[in-house]
A protein has these predicted regions:
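Ligand-binding pockets and gating/stacking loops
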Residues: 2-464
Length: 464
């Protein structure tokens, strides 16, 4: 059958299709990546979720959060200006240094206002990271500010299937501390000043949200429940996929093959997680059904799902909280079992600092995995998915031992649709609000906004 399909498409003339074309089947709808074949197919069984659409790729905004601060001495580049050599912690991103913006001197003073005298600023750091707002001291009623991702989602969310996508890899449960709700330590995305956006940790549930794995269609067909869940989503849309491949160019067929292969591979890894025993390397972090036993596999799956969401324009705004603030998760595959939070209170112990550096570099290697994938995905006008994205990465705490929010470890990856300079390290006065960077990101993504959080001006030096 595959051979016949190849023969039938060999002489087919490419026809125009919508950027919003979706493949449909029983209980499934599969969004597609950007294809060069144009606008809309008329009179075809292939369904369109939204008609029309610009050929200019949209800007995607993705915000990553890591807890407990970093080892600052190996985070910042030695020299300002062009990035010639990256510091030790950032070296996994060396292949993408021309896409990096490194910053020195950004602060979230709003996180300091209500900090405990002993320096317990975990919840305040996480809360202010994307909001530039002060966490309201209360164990029952939370209040902060709307986050940058949600402001962007409000601006562009009506054009996508999901206004935003919030992901994490650790249970969002956390106890109250020093008069502050534990919610502050487990949320970086805020839809309103009083409504934090919960993140999803289960890759299968994220996959189903993206690709419409809806078992309600069982009752409209003769498909049994066991057959439905055993079938790949690609099996359910294969007829639509075959028709589409007959109507597009050779280049688009190659892109479709690569994309569908990626979807099948991610789906297979999720199914493996569903069928594996419920045990955990970390007794303190019990694993629900559908969560990979291997933590790295969990991280990488979430990266792949974010890439698929951006590639198909299913969403343009996403956050990724790798682990919750003040986590004491350990990383035995790095050669030690000390908890992350315990290590962050290093008291300048060289052994603890070495281990913190290894955790920092490991987290950056996960970011590098996603960045490399985004660099490989072609979009319009010779650009890539990474060209049309801005990925903010950092922590709301600078030094975990001091629990401060001064000179935060922050970097920005991507070119924002060609609007941003990159490949540079900028040093700013130590009183520069990080909100200036968040404001600049929103403006360069096309949001008509003049201030954000405690901003004083858009951060200079980013405009291309």
């Amino acid at each position: 059958m595959r051979k016949d399909n190849k023969q039938s498409t060999r002489n087919a003339q490419p026809q125009s299709i919508s950027r919003r074309t979706m493949l449909r089947g029983v209980g499934a709808s599969l969004a597609l990546p950007w294809l060069e074949s144009g606008s809309a197919i008329a009179n075809t069984p292939i369904a369109n979720a939204v008609t029309g659409g610009s050929d200019q790729p949209p800007v995607r905004m993705c915000c990553w959060y890591v807890p407990n601060g970093v080892h600052l001495q190996t985070w910042f580049p030695k020299h300002d200006g062009a990035l010639v050599e990256l510091p030790e912690t950032l070296r996994p991103l060396s292949f993408a240094r021309n896409y990096l913006n490194c910053f020195d001197g950004l602060n979230h003073n709003t996180a300091n206002i209500n900090s405990d005298p002993d320096g317990c600023g975990h919840g305040q750091g996480a809360t202010s990271f994307l909001t530039g707002a002060q966490a309201f001291r209360s164990q029952d009623n939370v209040k902060a500010g709307m986050s940058v991702d949600q402001i962007y989602a409000q601006h562009v969310g009506r054009a996508t299937r999901l206004p935003s996508l919030e992901l994490g890899c650790e249970s969002p449960r956390s106890g109250n501390a020093f008069g502050f709700s534990g919610t502050y330590k487990t949320h970086i995305s805020w839809r309103t000043p009083t409504s934090p956006a919960p993140y999803e940790i289960n890759p299968k549930l994220v996959f189903d949200r993206l690709f419409g794995n809806d078992s309600s269609d069982l009752y409209k067909t003769s498909v049994t429940e066991s057959d439905f869940y055993r079938k790949s989503i690609l099996d359910r849309v294969q007829e639509d996929a075959r028709r589409l491949q007959m109507r597009v160019s050779h280049s688009d067929r190659r892109k479709l093959d690569q994309y569908l292969t990626s979807v099948r591979e991610v789906e297979g890894r999720i199914q493996n997680a569903n069928s594996s025993p419920l045990k955990s390397q970390n007794a303190d972090f019990q694993r629900p059904l559908g969560i990979p036993e291997d933590f790295e596999e969990h991280l990488l799956l979430m990266c792949d799902l974010m890439v698929l969401a951006f590639q198909t324009d299913s969403t343009r705004a996403s956050t990724f909280m790798l682990t919750k603030e003040a986590t004491d998760r350990n990383y035995p595959w790095l050669g030690f079992t000390d908890g992350h939070h315990e290590l962050s209170h290093h008291a300048n112990d060289p052994v603890k600092n070495r281990k913190i550096r290894e955790i920092d570099r490991y987290h950056i290697s996960i970011l590098a995995y996603m960045v490399e994938k985004m660099m490989s995905i072609e979009e319009a006008n010779g650009s890539t998915l990474l060209d049309n994205s801005m990925i903010l990465y950092g922590s709301g705490i600078s030094d975990g031992d001091r629990h401060d929010h001064i000179n935060l470890p922050v970097l920005l990856v991507g070119k924002g649709g060609g609007t941003m300079k990159a490949g540079q390290h900028q040093k700013f006065h130590r009183e520069t609000p990080m909100s200036n960077l968040l404001l600049a990101m929103l403006q360069q993504a096309g949001v008509p906004i003049q201030s954000f959080g405690d901003s004083t001006e858009p951060l200079p030096g980013l405009l291309s």
